[in-house]
């Protein structure tokens, strides 16, 4: 290998309120696994339906000053899908939290998604196996539920009452007949 050859890497970035923001270093295995698991769940469910699941890497254009790259999105209005990305608010957006994007995902992006009319927004925390589900209410994305996949050792220490309160699956607000299992979202992590 020639040491004089420079390694060129694609730099992932977003445009937030007109400001170019470099995204975290390349996503971790767990980050990608979670995004893939969520995408696969929706992609399988939506086969043959009007809405489509769109994986990480697709640009999302919401305003003249905002170009984002969410980890996964659902778009039901196919007119919003163009050759270079999605133009307009998706119906569901998913962000898997990373140290470098955490603040923007919870702050500016959540506010922007509210203003643009995103119906549902998920924030997923890989380290704690937690999913926050936000729903649009009166023009604001409000926390609806927080779901947590408990490890076996914690479940073993719970009494019957605590175990009865543990949620292992939930529904997306867009689809009454789709039951999403937390163990599927957080499957095969290291």
Enumerate the predicted regions with their spans:
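Gly/Pro/Ser/Thr-rich low-complexity, intrinsically disordered segments predominantly at protein N-termini
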Residues: 1-190
């Amino acid at each position: 290998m020639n040491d004089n050859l420079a390694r060129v890497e694609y730099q992932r970035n977003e445009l937030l309120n007109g400001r170019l923001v470099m995204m975290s270093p390349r996503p971790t295995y767990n980050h990608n696994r979670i995004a893939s698991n969520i995408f696969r769940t929706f992609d399988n469910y939506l086969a043959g339906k009007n809405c489509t699941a769109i994986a990480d890497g697709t640009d999302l254009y919401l305003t003249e000053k905002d170009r984002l790259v969410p980890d996964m999105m659902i778009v039901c209005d196919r007119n919003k899908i163009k050759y270079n990305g999605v133009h307009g608010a998706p119906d569901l957006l998913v962000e898997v939290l990373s140290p470098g994007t955490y603040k923007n995902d919870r702050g500016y992006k959540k506010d922007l998604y509210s203003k643009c009319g995103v119906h549902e927004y998920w924030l997923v925390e890989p380290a704690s196996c937690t999913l926050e589900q936000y729903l649009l209410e009166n023009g604001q994305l409000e926390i609806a539920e927080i779901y947590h996949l408990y490890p076996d050792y914690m479940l073993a220490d719970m009494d019957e009452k605590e175990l009865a309160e543990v949620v292992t699956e939930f529904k997306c607000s867009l689809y009454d007949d789709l039951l999403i299992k937390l163990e599927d979202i957080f499957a095969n992590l290291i």
